[in-house]
Amino acid sequence: MQNITQSWFVQGMIKATTDAWLKGWDERNGGNLTLRLDDADIAPYHDNFHQQPRYIPLSQPMPLLANTPFIVTGSGKFFRNVQLDPAANLGIVKVDSDGAGYHILWGLTNEAVPTSELPAHFLSHCERIKATNGKDRVIMHCHATNLIALTYVLENDTAVFTRQLWEGSTECLVVFPDGVGILPWMVPGTDEIGQATAQEMQKHSLMLWPFHGVFGSGPTLDETFGLIDTAEKSAQILVKVYSMGGMKQTISREELIALGQRFGVTPLASALAL
């Protein structure tokens, strides 16, 4: 019998959650992570599955995700503990044939359940599947320190925030030319914030929840982690710059245009126009 904890997807989740905790982005039970899988990924590990998988209904049907397996972090679970006990802190779930709920196939032992942000994740997965023709498979939420700090001092506007991050570090425009979406503050763990996030995810791979955290999407765990890491690095630079009195010079609009042309990306027009 193959051990599922040695699979690429469990090992990938262990690395991503451990790295995020070491970055200081996921204190206590902060943050959550989901990865969309294929049946072929989990097929070799059926012997590891629960004999009687628990069924949990979704608060709203998601037919686009019907029959789709995911590996997810658990509700109330600490990222720092995933590496110590993957089966207690992670779970593999599979959405049923009509998208009305899911079965917990593996993990989430002792009656644990998936992250409370699962509605936001699943809704965002639906939108990113459509926006990227199925390329994006990961949704990651974390409490990236400097990005959160900037939501207290910058205007919480997509164009303004995006432009500042682009100017904070040259690689940002290349990594997220579609900019950073921003919501008003909302109560977490609700369908409302999930729907609002998913709506912005139609246009942006990176989302900010002011005074709370960040939501990122990408095709792989590494790409999604790297997306957030790049934005957070720029935010860290900006925090230092603002604390030293602000910018005296920066990357110009013309230089941003040239950067986009060099790397074959189309920058968010509203941010470029500022």
UniProtKB/Swiss-Prot annotation:
Record-linked InterPro entries: Aldolase_class_II_sugar_metab, Aldolase_II/adducin_N, Aldolase_II/adducin_N_sf, Rhamnulose-1-P_Aldolase
Alphabetized GO MF terms: metal ion binding; rhamnulose-1-phosphate aldolase activity
Presence of the UniProt keyword Secreted in the record: no
Keyword Metal-binding: yes
GO CC terms, sorted: cytosol
GO biological process: pentose catabolic process; rhamnose catabolic process
Family annotation (Gene3D superfamilies): Class II aldolase/adducin N-terminal domain
Binding site residues for Zn(2+): 141, 143, 212
S-S bridge residues: none
Cofactor(s), by name: Zn(2+)
Localisation: Cytoplasm
Chief location bin: cytoplasm
Pathway of action: Carbohydrate degradation; L-rhamnose degradation; glycerone phosphate from L-rhamnose: step 3/3
Cofactor details (free text): Binds 1 zinc ion per subunit.
Swiss-Prot/TrEMBL catalytic activity: L-rhamnulose 1-phosphate = (S)-lactaldehyde + dihydroxyacetone phosphate
EC number: 4.1.2.19
Active site per database record: 117
Keywords: Cytoplasm, Lyase, Metal-binding, Rhamnose metabolism, Zinc
Subunit-level organization: Homotetramer.
Family, per entry: Belongs to the aldolase class II family. RhaD subfamily.
Function: Catalyzes the reversible cleavage of L-rhamnulose-1-phosphate to dihydroxyacetone phosphate (DHAP) and L-lactaldehyde.
Name of the protein in question: Rhamnulose-1-phosphate aldolase
